[in-house]
From Swiss-Prot:
The gene is prfA. Pfam families: PCRF, RF-1. The modification N5-methylglutamine is found at residue 236. The keyword Cytoplasm applies. PROSITE patterns: RF_PROK_I. Belongs to the prokaryotic/mitochondrial release factor family. This is Peptide chain release factor 1. Gene3D superfamilies: 3.30.160.20, 3.30.70.1660, 6.10.140.1950.
Length: 361
């Protein structure tokens, strides 16, 4: 904790400097600079507050130890001992919380994401489960106050999805959903199963951070643009004008569809932004083989034996195999109540990170 303490002292000094800067009229007048400063202050606030509480508790313990050493008032001594016991527990908890807050930040944690869900092993049932996962993530996003838009999809005849790509925007989206990468296995009786037998199917989920201000030039000749009528929410505007836009990047086959904006021009702009992000991700991997390997590494092959999580409908049970977490709350989880699962995954991986740092210290 000693090396962490030195970092915390420096952090507190910087925090006080930032608070002074936030009251400086020159900084306030510079909108960009002021936004940078307020973000830095917000990022530091929690750890500085906990560090100050940690120091205050330490001082209080020292004061109580003086009372105990004096020993002239037995009643005060007993109270000081009880208080120190509680403070020691609080300090221990604060140490753990501070260590986690001081862990190196994932540079992508604040970013929005593109999530791709594909029906894998299991035919029609896998495609239906892909649709169920889509709705689960949509409801979770709604609970978080995030926005979701479908950017590409291929539905099946039974109403499921062979594949669907969505963009989720909001506060710290990637930090919450980055652990959803992988094969998700479902065990249930398909609606098409007359004998009532439980089947096992899978769908894969890939989560990719959305790149901001991607510096890539796309040749307009290599982009096919299709316009069509919007469907879904939108009131009387629906199906009266061709405002929805689908863009296909011909060299890579990457497709983006956008219909959530109010006009074709807005949909074109948003679709191009997302297309650039996805093409950039593709070319960052050098070639399609590396791109496919990257995606496969994220989601696996989708084989039934591969899974990060199992959704067992007959037993109303969800098991995350990476951390051995089992919850008999499948109905609630499929309704978007993912917090308990995501929080447990976050704690698990933060703990692993702390252990690795301790080993290398």
């Amino acid at each position: 904790m000693d090396n962490v303490m030195a970092q915390l002292e420096s952090l507190e000094v910087r925090y006080e400097e930032i608070q002074e800067m936030m009251a400086d009229p020159e900084v306030i007048a510079d909108t960009k600079r002021y936004m940078e400063i307020t973000k830095e202050e917000a990022d530091m606030r929690e750890v500085v507050q906990k560090f100050r509480k940690f120091k205050a508790d330490k001082e209080e313990i020292a004061g109580n130890k003086e009372i105990i050493a004096d020993g002239s008032d037995p009643e005060l001594v007993e109270m000081a001992k009880m208080e120190n016991s509680e403070l020691e527990d609080e300090i221990s908890q604060l140490e753990d919380e501070i260590k986690i807050l001081m862990l190196p930040k994932d540079p992508n944690d604040d970013k929005d994401i593109i999530m791709e869900i594909r029906g894998a092993a299991g035919g029609d049932e896998a495609s239906l489960f892909a649709g169920d996962l889509l709705r689960m993530y949509e409801k979770y996003a709604e609970n978080q106050g995030w926005n979701v838009s479908i950017v590409d999809s291929e539905q099946t005849e039974v109403g499921g999805y062979k594949r669907v790509a969505i963009m989720i925007t909001g506060n710290k989206v990637y930090s919450k959903l980055k652990y959803e990468n992988g094969a998700h296995r479902v065990q249930r009786i398909p609606v098409t199963e007359s004998a009532g037998r439980v089947h096992t199917s899978t769908a894969t989920v890939a989560v990719m951070p959305e790149y901001e201000q991607v510096d890539i030039d796309l040749d307009p000749k290599e982009i096919r643009v299709d316009v069509y009528r919007s469907s879904g929410a939108g009131g009387q505007h629906i199906n009266k004008t061709s405002s929805a836009v689908r863009m296909t990047h011909l060299p890579t086959g990457i497709v983006v569809a956008m219909q959530d904006q109010r006009s074709q021009q807005q949909n074109r702009a948003k679709a191009m932004e997302i297309l650039k992000s996805r093409v950039y991700d593709y070319y960052e991997s050098q070639n399609r083989d590396k791109y496919d390997a990257k995606r496969k590494n994220a989601v696996g092959t989708g084989d039934r034996s591969e899974r990060i999580r199992t959704y067992n409908y007959p037993q109303n049970r969800v098991t995350d195999h990476r951390i051995g977490l089992t919850l008999n709350k499948l109905d609630r989880i499929m309704n978007g109540e993912l917090d308990e699962v995501i929080d447990a995954l976050t704690v698990y991986y933060q703990t692993k990170q702390l252990e690795e740092l301790a080993e290398n210290a």
